[in-house]
């Protein structure tokens, strides 16, 4: 962005991501759906991209925030395996979409939310960090236009300056 002389007002999604990231000192991605800005932040079990897409699916399907789309019966074994194999402690976006597809076989609300994913095609998003390749590829496959700050996460740690 600096090279192109672009600031946080260039896209509507940049400023909300930066503000939330600075406030909470965690990586954040924001995305504009229609006129609304949706954010996803890193949690103990989700990548920011995964959190963003779950929040977007809830918004598009009108699912309240307190309703979980991912079943604990699916999440727990996945997280346990990641821990055992030392492949991280958060689910990536591709892993979350896989878990959602499994949950959709027994939960029609999740199935409807998955069907609404096509509505995010062409949306603008901004990350406060350099998104890892797996999440970035999946966001690209979902046809989301992504910009990123030049901040790396090192060893799953994030220091936003």
Regions picked out by a protein language model, each given a short descriptive name:
Residues 8-12:
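Positively charged, low-complexity intrinsically disordered leader regions
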Residues 1, 5, 16-23, 65-161:
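C-terminal binding/interaction regions
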Residues 38-39:
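Generic structural signal for well-ordered beta-strand positions
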């Amino acid at each position: 962005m600096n090279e192109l002389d672009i600031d946080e007002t260039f896209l509507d999604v940049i400023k909300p991501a930066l503000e939330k990231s600075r406030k909470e000192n965690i990586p954040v991605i924001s995305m504009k759906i229609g006129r609304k800005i949706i954010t996803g932040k890193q949690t103990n079990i989700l990548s920011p991209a995964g959190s963003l897409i779950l929040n977007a699916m809830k918004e598009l399907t009108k699912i309240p925030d307190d309703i979980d789309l991912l079943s604990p019966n699916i999440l727990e074994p996945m997280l346990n395996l990641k821990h055992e194999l030392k492949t991280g402690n958060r689910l990536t976006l591709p892993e979350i979409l896989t878990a959602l597809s499994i949950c959709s076989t027994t939960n029609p609300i999740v199935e409807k939310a998955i069907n609404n994913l096509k509505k995010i095609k062409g949306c603008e998003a901004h990350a406060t960090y350099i998104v890892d390749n797996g999440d970035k590829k999946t966001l690209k496959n979902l046809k989301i236009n992504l910009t990123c700050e030049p901040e790396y996460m090192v060893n799953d740690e994030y220091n936003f300056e």
